[in-house]
Amino acid sequence: MSPQTETKASVGFKAGVKEYKLTYYTPEYQTKDTDILAAFRVTPQPGVPPEEAGAAVAAESSTGTWTTVWTDGLTSLDRYKGRCYRIERVVGEKDQYIAYVAYPLDLFEEGSVTNMFTSIVGNVFGFKALRALRLEDLRIPPAYVKTFQGPPHGIQVERDKLNKYGRPLLGCTIKPKLGLSAKNYGRAVYECLRGGLDFTKDDENVNSQPFMRWRDRFLFCAEALYKAQAETGEIKGHYLNATAGTCEEMIKRAVFARELGVPIVMHDYLTGGFTANTSLAHYCRDNGLLLHIHRAMHAVIDRQKNHGIHFRVLAKALRMSGGDHIHSGTVVGKLEGERDITLGFVDLLRDDFVEQDRSRGIYFTQDWVSLPGVLPVASGGIHVWHMPALTEIFGDDSVLQFGGGTLGHPWGNAPGAVANRVALEACVKARNEGRDLAQEGNEIIREACKWSPELAAACEVWKEIVFNFAAVDVLDK
């Protein structure tokens, strides 16, 4: 017998496998203000008790492994282990439970969303004892929040930079998303901006392809927005997508955007990755650039109700990693988004303090302390008839983004932009006068059509376009 084995034997080490719940299920545990708290939707395999499943999640996402190891004796498990401290049965669902897990803050590197997710949603999601696992929510303690820079600038600073107050901002994604030359792309940008939009946008998959290299696109878009600014007297922006195959190339593109003097760049934060996103957010803070975030790939992760990560968690992670805008769904458009759930994570993006509210899917009270807020972006299948609902749902601190709803106007891009701006101004005016946008929305739009032929034409084109599909991800009953 080796000296090491003799030493461990003397303190009671016993090799073998024991149930996770004996170590990691601790219903008596009182959570600390510094703990990261997680709510998991757990679907155990047949025959696996919920307590064992919840404890397995806590173990495999913190200090545990499948067998007892002698090196456990070289550290303090009580200090570092995750703890499943509560389990609730999901009403109306067979064999589904919400397992609450507390993680000590010392498990995580400061200022790193990458490290946080590597632990909490790493290998545990492939664990055989679970049929499915979904991370529903996280509580990020103020002590950890303060290690992040967060959004480069935030809502108020953006409004001050743009000199735009008292209404939602208007945007448009240039279509077709792929295939235009840089010059034709810039022309479309110019027409939309001179028509009254605040922003135009690269689509998420516009990077640097053979038909339009990034440097050419940046130059023509900068020319377009400066020309539109000179004609309208308003500050304009175009989301120049800096996403690239390497972090070095991404930063190079952001540097060129700064040299052109444009106000905003863009990043695909899930496909690009949190490390790249945080790096770009830090560059934008240091160099006065706003940062628009697209959530391409999110539905692969968040759409299924029993497995993956809920978007409210991805939204919190983005606020920590850094971004001034993020796409959030529309409630009324073509993309998934149930109203109460959407409004729940919109508040988590914008507000400083959000109370627990299970009716909106918010499992934990979240205090963001001094972290700036993020503007939610409503985009996807929306048009002028949706304007009253969007204004009522999202309020002033939002970006309403009409791609096809601008470029599909029968008279062209600029009239499409005019129609959207007129519809927005009419809705804001009506709201400020005390009218009910939810009840009187269609009437408000029809009244505005009388003095805007561009809006009237848009209303005629899209009068019968609806997307009546039930949401897949809905609140538990």
UniProtKB/Swiss-Prot annotation:
Modified residues annotated as N-acetylproline in this record: P3
Cofactor: Mg(2+)
Database matches in Gene3D superfamilies: Ribulose bisphosphate carboxylase, large subunit, C-terminal domain, RuBisCO large subunit, N-terminal domain
Residues at which substrate binds: N123, T173, K177, R295, H327, S379
Annotated cofactor note: Binds 1 Mg(2+) ion per subunit.
EC number(s) from the headed UniProt entry: 4.1.1.39
Any Gene Ontology CC annotation: chloroplast
Pro-piece positions: 1-2
MF terms (GO), sorted A to Z: magnesium ion binding; monooxygenase activity; ribulose-bisphosphate carboxylase activity
Reaction catalysis annotation: 2 (2R)-3-phosphoglycerate + 2 H(+) = D-ribulose 1,5-bisphosphate + CO2 + H2O; D-ribulose 1,5-bisphosphate + O2 = 2-phosphoglycolate + (2R)-3-phosphoglycerate + 2 H(+)
Keyword Metal-binding on entry: yes
Active site: K175, H294
Keywords annotated in UniProt: Acetylation, Calvin cycle, Carbon dioxide fixation, Chloroplast, Disulfide bond, Lyase, Magnesium, Metal-binding, Methylation, Monooxygenase, Oxidoreductase, Photorespiration, Photosynthesis, Plastid
Site positions for Transition state stabilizer: K334
Post-translational modification: The disulfide bond which can form between Cys-247 in the large chain dimeric partners within the hexadecamer appears to be associated with oxidative stress and protein turnover. The disulfide bonds reported in 3RUB and 4RUB may be the result of oxidation during crystallization.
Pfam families: RuBisCO_large (PF00016), RuBisCO_large_N (PF02788)
The keyword Oxidoreductase belongs to this UniProt entry's keyword annotation: yes
Function: RuBisCO catalyzes two reactions: the carboxylation of D-ribulose 1,5-bisphosphate, the primary event in carbon dioxide fixation, as well as the oxidative fragmentation of the pentose substrate in the photorespiration process. Both reactions occur simultaneously and in competition at the same active site.
Membership in a protein family: Belongs to the RuBisCO large chain family. Type I subfamily.
Subunit and interaction comment: Heterohexadecamer of 8 large chains and 8 small chains; disulfide-linked. The disulfide link is formed within the large subunit homodimers.
Protein name as catalogued: Ribulose bisphosphate carboxylase large chain
Organism encoding this protein: Nicotiana tabacum (Common tobacco)
Gene it is expressed from: rbcL
